[in-house]
A protein has these predicted regions:
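A short beta-strand-turn-helix
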Residues: 56-79, 102-105
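Short active-site neighborhood of thiol/selenol oxidoreductases, capturing the structured segment around
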Residues: 68-92, 98, 112
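Structural recognition of the beta-strand scaffold that forms the well-ordered cores
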Residues: 79-82, 111-115, 141-144, 164
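Thiol/disulfide oxidoreductase modules built on the thioredoxin-like
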Residues: 134-138, 144-187, 341-345
Length: 369
């Protein structure tokens, strides 16, 4: 799940410090102590880098977007490896920086490599990942890591997990979670200079994400990630609780407290998602955030599923997200993250409701920003 935790930008031989990060945590763990100097202090980090990371990448399969001249061409290059998954909001908000680094330094000896390690079942489908990389303008090479082979080799722990490898093939720094991108870019420049590349003519210009990729409003973010499937669900408030793996007619709660949610209509709640089983249905969440996202899967018949978003019972108007209009209408066409709400002005506790017009839609997780 997404948490705000203090994880440093750990760097071998280069200054590092602790920072607040937003992370989608995974299950694979590796733990050693990796000292890094920061103002004459030692920063310890949960990290176990592979001794030969380039060899790990060279042996990985399949490449959805191949490395020009093949994986062997990575040897002798400065490489940034990004573990991501395309429905994770934390991964999406990191993309503007990775794109910019690839564009700025690709001709100076840098290769950015994406390692797509799926969280949900639909993210294992190569066609879905290819569509997502096209829609998200991820032009740098990407490999698909459905069985987490590369993830485990790097002892990665969450999305995004960003690793900085020097031209000699050594992991020199890593970042678990969002943030500290300025330090990441400075490290890239240092590693390129060490390898004999002149980056003095490349300006350190600001990088700004837009739309769903815009940085979160951390100061007013009071809602955590909330899974809908019973494996990780918390805050479910419909009377009677879940009826697991069976269709059930759910009723809305009389009142939702902050960070509670409910269902209305006939839903089948599984471990990973809730499936609208018949008729129209609604899901609600009481939130405190600027942005509201919901990861949704389309109907099995491939036809779009229309939905309508309301905030405290009214159309979102100017507070609509990129995937709905001012009246609140949107369509589920692909399995992905949908931005429902982007507010401006004062942020307060509010209730978002999403009503789906017909069955077949799958709801996975609410995320916020």
């Amino acid at each position: 799940m997404t948490l705000r935790r203090s994880f440093g930008f750990a760097v071998a031989g280069i200054a590092a410090a602790g920072a607040t990060a937003a992370i989608c945590f995974g299950d694979a763990l590796g733990l050693v102590r990796s000292p890094a100097k920061a103002d004459d202090s030692i920063v310890s980090a949960r990290f176990d880098a592979p001794a030969h990371p380039i060899e790990v990448l060279q042996g990985a399969r399949p490449w959805l977007t191949p490395v020009p001249d093949g994986p062997k061409a990575l040897r002798g290059k400065v490489v940034v490896v990004n573990f991501w998954t395309y429905s994770c909001i934390n991964s999406l908000r990191a993309l503007p920086y990775l794109r910019a680094w690839s564009e700025r330094y690709g001709s100076k000896g840098l290769d950015v490599i994406g390692v797509h390690a799926p969280e949900f079942g639909f993210e294992k489908n190569p066609a879905n990942v290819r569509l997502a990389t096209s829609q998200l303008r991820v032009a740098y090479p990407n490999l698909q890591d459905n069985d987490y082979t590369v993830w485990r080799a790097f002892a990665n722990q969450g999305w995004p997990g960003i690793y900085f490898i020097d031209a000699k093939g050594k992991v020199r720094g890593y970042r678990l979670g969002e943030g500290r991108y300025d330090e990441g870019e400075r490290l890239i420049r240092t590693l390129l200079a060490e390898a004999g590349h002149d980056v003095s003519g490349v300006p350190l210009a600001p990088i700004e994400g837009t739309g769903v990729e815009a940085q979160a409003d951390w100061a007013d973010l009071g809602s955590p990630e909330a899974y809908i499937g019973y494996d990780k669900a918390a805050g479910f408030a419909s009377p009677g609780g879940f009826r697991s793996d069976a269709a059930n007619n759910y009723a809305p709660a009389a009142r939702l407290s902050l960070n509670q949610w409910d269902l209305a209509g006939s839903w089948k709640v599984g471990g990973e998602y809730a499936l609208l089983d018949s008729g129209p249905g609604t899901i609600r969440f009481r939130f405190h955030a600027r942005d509201v996202h919901l990861v949704l899967g389309g109907a099995a018949d491939g036809k779009p599923v229309r939905f309508r978003v309301t905030i405290d019972g009214s159309a979102p108007g100017a507070g609509h997200g990129v995937d709905v209009d001012a009246a609140g209408w949107g369509e589920v066409r692909e399995d992905r993250l949908y931005q429902l709400v982007r507010q401006s002005g004062a942020i307060a506790d509010r209730t978002v409701a999403v009503e789906f017009s017909r069955p077949g839609v799958r709801a996975y997780v609410f995320t916020f920003g």
